[in-house]
Structures are given as structure tokens and as C-alpha cells.
Amino acid sequence: MQPAKLLMPESFGLSQIGPNIYLESGADETTRTTLREAMVKAESSIRAAYGSVVSRPIVHACISKECYESFGGRGAERAKIFGDRILLSPRGLNWHYLAHEWSHDEIRTRLNFSAWRHMPQWFDEGVAVAISEAPENSETHWQFLIDTNVPRPSRDELLAFRSMKQWLEAVHRYGETQNLERKAKGEPEVRPVYTAAGHELRPWLATLGSAGFLRFIERLNSGEDFDTVYRNGNTATEKYITQSMLAIPAHSSP
């Protein structure tokens, strides 16, 4: 019942501040401006990745924990999506988390039901991480995980997180659900699963570009096997990286 309240946001403490944007009543003008600007930036990031924007999610933003939880959110989360309804927590009021959830809606809108149903969860999340550019899931964070020996999924393990259930179990197993406790202790937060997915998808998306990504989606919609189509794109990525490295002049250390 809680997510259903998003269908009537103005009846449950939210006010419309722009097209498809609702914000918890009582928010100051700075927060309103920040959210409107985040909407523009998030849309721009979706367009850059997909070449255009076909989805139009409705954004619901909370400035209090009570508001977020009243719509079905949980304390440790920054954002979540219910169909085409994005819910932002007080910790997720920026373009990064808005773009992340928007990417889920965009790819769901572009895929037919069969293709969407067969798309692995790691891929959906990895695309969203790469597009949203959140510092918490960046290559810098990936290197931090390596340098500090934080447990993280291997590539083979990551590619096995196909269902939402498998994904959420991995997120819990690798400690991403304990970040509030880490923060309270003054310890750095870790996000090995989401960051691993972004690490896998960044070079793949960069090599394909928006046109190649759209061709990939078309092939899935035509009924081609996901793993085969992804592997073809990943082979192109590996060739691109190898060629780029060969093009760099060699330098000797003094």
C-alpha cells in the first residue's frame, strides 16, 4: 500500500514544483532549485547514453526520513523506483541518484517484455551506475576497494547475479546494507557490488557509444540471446582497450 501513495502524492504531503517533480511540502527554495537542476542534469545524462529520452518518470523527493519511509523507502537507501515512479530519500537528492533510477525506467521502456525479463540484474544496475556517475560507485572507489582489500565479487561472480533476488543477496553479503553503521562509527562506506557492476559496464558503454547501445537493445528486442549479444560487444571493448594501449608510446623510467 505504501508505494501506491505515489499515485496521489499531493494527498500525502508532497507538492508539485515542476513537470513530473513532487517535493515534500515545507522544503526551502534552495532545495527546490537543487531538485529542478538535478532533473535537467539527469535527463541530459540519459540522453547522452541512449541518444534520446523516451521515458518520463515522475519524481517524488523527500527531505525527511519519515516522508521517505511513508512511501515505502527504507532508511539505508538513497533512492528507489516503482515502475515509472522514482522516490528519492533525503540522502539521494542529487542528479546522480535521480539518473540512476531514471536509467532503470529508460531501459525498461525501450525493451519489450521478453527482452526486459531476460536482462540480468547486474547489467541493469551496471548501466545505471555508469550513467549516473555517483562518486560512491566510481572507479576511484573501485581502486579504494582494491587497495584496502575489501571483499568484492569477481567478474564471473558478478555476471551470475541475474535475478533481483541474487543481486540483493549479494549486496547484503558484501556489506553494502551495513553502511549506516559504518558511517556512525566514522568508517568509510563500501559498495563493492554496485561498483563492480559499474566497473564492468563503463568501458563497454564507452566503446559502443549511444548508437551501438541502441543496436544492442534492438538485437535483444528481436529475440537474440543476451549473453551472446553482450559477449560480442565486450569483445569489441577488449579490442578497443588493447588498441588504445598499443597506441601509447612506451617510456622508460629514469
PLM region spans:
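N-terminal low-structure segments adjacent to metalloprotease catalytic domains
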Residues: 1-15, 246-254
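Juxtacatalytic substrate-recognition/specificity segment
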Residues: 6-120, 134, 226
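Acidic/His/Gly-enriched intrinsically disordered linker/tail segments
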Residues: 97, 115-197, 206-254
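Short charge-dense sequence patches
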Residues: 1, 48-56, 75-84, 143-152, ...
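N-terminal functional modules and adjacent low-complexity/disordered segments of proteins
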Residues: 2-3, 108, 163
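Surface-exposed aromatic
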Residues: 84-88, 125, 198
